[in-house]
């Protein structure tokens, strides 16, 4: 485990040694804050309108602001993941340092886990920017905490799944641009699968719908944890990292 920790720390340090980590955090914080501001403004406006018109009970902050906002955050990850993972292995291969890793006394699994965990920690740092903004909502409106925590669990699992896919693609090329572009295409495809099967109930449509990352995050966004969603995310993480290990083994033999 010490080797995994050292590789993870090295990977995380490399992110923060360049502008990429700060740019991604700033980009995410800016977009999230802008969407939150507009959602909160609309919520307050509609609340006043309902009071003046003698409407029903109070509007739900969870339903009207937080759930749609975290759903939007799920969409932003499609753009963040390729930028995080495109350099994981591609840069090592381009610079020739991958040979040093492969000939060092560490296993392929330790290398892959260390790099994936480093990417995950950066993703969590980016995600933490949203928690700072949401803290203001909790100070102001007292929303229900449990659905928010479940939604964040879904975001973390979805992020881990997509980062695993990105790591796999990065291990197959030495060009960061190609790695980032292919990763974006793949995660976008997984995101769009549920839309393509919306009006179809056939077996193939059910399979494609199950493979869609949106389908599995929807339950988390509603505050619901289902076993099938956990199995999907953990299976995708395991599968992508396993295939990455096969790619690394091939590189080791060539090295």
Per-segment meaning from a language model:
Residues 1-25:
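Aromatic- and glycine-rich beta-strand/loop motifs that create alpha-glucan
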Residues 19-43, 74-80, 187-189:
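Hydrophobic alpha-helical transmembrane segments of multi-pass membrane transport/permease proteins
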Residues 28-32, 118-119, 155, 184-188, ...:
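Residue-level recognition of pore/gate-forming positions within transmembrane alpha-helices
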Residues 32-37, 57-71, 113-174, 225:
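Secretory targeting signals
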Residues 39-63, 179-247, 252-255:
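Terminal transmembrane helical anchor/hairpin motif
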Residues 65-91, 126:
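Long, hydrophobic alpha-helical segments
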Residues 81-85, 133, 164-165, 243-244:
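Hydrophobic/aromatic residues in alpha-helical transmembrane segments
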Residues 88-118:
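Helix-loop-helix units of permease transmembrane domains in multi-pass membrane transporters
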């Amino acid at each position: 485990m010490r080797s995994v920790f050292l590789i993870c720390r090295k990977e995380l340090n490399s992110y923060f040694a360049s502008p990429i980590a700060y740019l991604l955090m700033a980009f995410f914080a800016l977009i999230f804050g802008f969407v939150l501001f507009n959602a909160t403004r609309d919520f307050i406006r509609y609340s006043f309108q309902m009071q003046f018109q003698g409407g029903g009970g109070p509007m739900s902050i969870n339903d009207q602001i937080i759930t749609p906002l975290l759903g939007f955050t799920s969409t932003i990850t499609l753009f963040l993941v390729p930028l995080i993972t495109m350099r994981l292995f591609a840069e090592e291969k381009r610079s020739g340092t991958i040979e040093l890793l492969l000939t060092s006394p560490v296993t392929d699994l330790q290398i892959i886990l260390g790099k994936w965990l480093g990417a995950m920690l950066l993703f969590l740092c980016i995600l933490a920017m949203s928690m700072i903004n949401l803290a203001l909502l909790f100070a102001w409106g007292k929303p229900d905490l449990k659905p928010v925590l479940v939604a964040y669990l879904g975001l973390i699992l979805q992020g881990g799944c997509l980062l695993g896919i990105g790591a796999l693609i990065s291990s197959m090329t030495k060009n960061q641009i190609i790695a980032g572009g292919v990763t974006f295409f793949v995660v976008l495809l997984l995101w769009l699968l549920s839309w393509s099967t919306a009006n179809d109930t056939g077996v193939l449509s059910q399979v494609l719908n199950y493979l869609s990352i949106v389908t599995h995050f929807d339950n988390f966004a509603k505050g619901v944890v289902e076993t099938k969603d956990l199995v999907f995310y953990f299976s995708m993480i395991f599968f992508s990292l396993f295939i990455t290990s096969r790619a690394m083994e091939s590189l080791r033999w060539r090295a």
